[in-house]
Amino acid sequence: MRRYTFQLLLIPMLSLFWLTASCTHRDVHFRIGVSQCSDDEWRHQMNNEMLREALFYDGVEVDIRTVKDDNAQQIEDIRHFIQEGVDLLVVAPNEAAPITPVVEEAFDRGIPVKVFARKILSDKYPAY
């Protein structure tokens, strides 16, 4: 009887294991890189909302990088996203002039760019 009980428990436990293991694996088909210029409460909330929305779509991954009003770091982060080959780049520029060339670089490489919060000094982005 004891062996039978163990076998009865083993089958549901293994089923549960396989079910949870399959839920944790997500194939990423669309990568979004987000470059934030600062990390105040408003932007924290925005980041959390973007991450939450991405959970509703299988295969979507959002990578958010935040700088603390540092143009050089933001340029480095955007270049990282370009090298990683993101499918969409979302940028909140710290300042327009320093960030414009790297956003143009992403655009010229065929990466769609969404600029928000402030514009850059170029028209090489499809959405503001």
Predicted features by range, described:
Residues 1-30, 104-111:
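Short, low-complexity disordered leader/linker segments with a strong preference
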Residues 2-3, 43, 65, 118:
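Basic side chains
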Residues 12, 79, 122-124:
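Composition-driven detection of intrinsically disordered, low-complexity segments
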Residues 21-26, 48-51, 74-75, 115:
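Short hydrophobic/aromatic-rich motifs at helix boundaries and adjacent loops
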Residues 26, 55-58, 127-128:
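Bacterial carbohydrate/catabolite-sensing allosteric modules
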Residues 31-53, 57, 62-80, 84-86, ...:
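Extracytoplasmic "Venus flytrap"
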Residues 96-128:
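Flexible loop/hinge segments that line or gate small-molecule binding clefts
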